């Protein structure tokens, strides 16, 4: 049991983790579509495996994945799906009228 009069304090590591979690964009939802598809930064999820649909940033990484996960299937670069060419650019939508944002500024 902790003493009733003693205040509970947070460690510096815990506070830093909270600050990091609050300020870092984790890329979920519509805000992270451009980051996940790799259109803007050019490195995220460029190639897709035709067998298991897992993504990889480059051909060498995809070859390593193929050799470890699909050893009985012949590796062919021509069958890989280039997601940068397939995915259309993200369309910018205008804000809808009558929808108020957060009150927290």
Swiss-Prot record:
Gene ablation phenotype (knockout): Normal plants under standard growth conditions, but severe symptoms of photooxidative damage under excess light due to a deficient induction of singlet oxygen 1O(2) detoxification reactions, thus leading to pale leaf phenotype, early senescence and lack of anthocyanin accumulation. Increased susceptibility to low temperatures and high photon flux density (PFD) conditions. Increased lipid peroxidation in response to beta-cyclocitral (beta-cc) associated with reduced induction of reactive oxygen species (ROS) responsive genes (e.g. AAA, LTI30, ZAT12 and WRKY40). Altered induction of gene (e.g.
Biased composition regions of type Basic and acidic residues, renumbered to the chain: 36-46
Chain's role: Required for acclimation to reactive oxygen species (ROS) responses downstream of beta-cyclocitral (beta-cc) or mediated by dihydroactinidiolide, including singlet oxygen 1O(2) detoxification reactions, especially upon light-mediated photooxidative stress, and leading to programmed cell death. Prevents leaf senescence. Involved in cold acclimation.
Full protein name: Protein METHYLENE BLUE SENSITIVITY 1
MF (Gene Ontology): DNA-binding transcription factor activity; transcription cis-regulatory region binding
Record's GO cellular component terms: cytoplasm; cytoplasmic stress granule; nucleus
A biological-process GO annotation: response to photooxidative stress
Origin: domain of life: Eukaryota
Statement: the UniProt record of this protein carries the keyword Ribonucleoprotein: no
Signals that turn on the gene: By high light. Triggered by the carotenoid metabolite beta-cyclocitral (beta-cc).
SS bonds (residue pairs): none
Region (Disordered) location: 26-46
